UniProtKB/Swiss-Prot annotation:
An annotated Gene Ontology molecular function: FMN binding
Family (UniProt): Belongs to the NrdI family.
Job of this protein: Probably involved in ribonucleotide reductase function.
HAMAP family per UniProt: NrdI (MF_00128)
InterPro entries documented for this protein: Flavoprotein-like_sf, RNR_Ib_NrdI_bac, RNR_NrdI
Protein name: Protein NrdI
Signal peptide boundaries: none
Record lineage: Bacteria, Pseudomonadati, Pseudomonadota, Alphaproteobacteria, Hyphomicrobiales
GO BP term, pick one: protein modification process
Organism: Rhizobium etli (strain ATCC 51251 / DSM 11541 / JCM 21823 / NBRC 15573 / CFN 42)
Gene (name only): nrdI
Classification via SUPFAM superfamilies: Flavoproteins
PANTHER family: PROTEIN NRDI
Length: 134
């Protein structure tokens, strides 16, 4: 199965979700993301930021990571975390990255996700990577 690349803030919500998947993963550092390079296909798991207006939905560290052409060339899909209290901007980082990188938006989950979210994502990633022929 392919690699998961993720960013998690100090809240560790995204980290806890990814850890529960039990899959191979690499974390985008909070600083120095421009020096963080991935050389294989990956699915990005990212939290959504913003106070409901949609601005700043993608964390700056993730933007820096994806601004590297090599990193961007290996992204195959995106999964986003969010907070449904923000209505239309729930999981907006996934929409933004999917559109800009032209990759599928595979799933969104709230905060740290539920056991059902973990099972769905794990099963979905198995199918996704099989279709990608990795």
């Amino acid at each position: 199965m392919g690699l998961i690349v993720y960013y998690s803030s100090r809240s560790e919500n995204t980290h806890r979700f990814v850890a529960r998947l039990g899959l191979r993963a690499a974390r985008i550092p909070a600083s120095g993301a421009d020096a963080f390079h991935i050389r294989e296909p990956f699915v990005l798991v990212v939290p959504t930021y913003s106070g409901g207006d949609g601005k700043g939905a993608v964390p700056k560290q993730v933007i820096r990571f994806l601004n590297d052409a090599e990193n961007r060339g290996h992204i195959r899909g995106v999964i986003a975390a969010g907070n449904s209290n923000f209505g239309e901007t729930y999981g907006l980082a996934g929409d933004v990255i999917s559109r800009k990188c032209q990759v599928p938006y595979l799933y969104r989950f709230e905060l740290i996700g539920t056991a059902e979210d973990v099972a769905k994502v794990k099963h979905g990633l198995e199918r996704f990577w099989t279709r990608q022929q990795l």
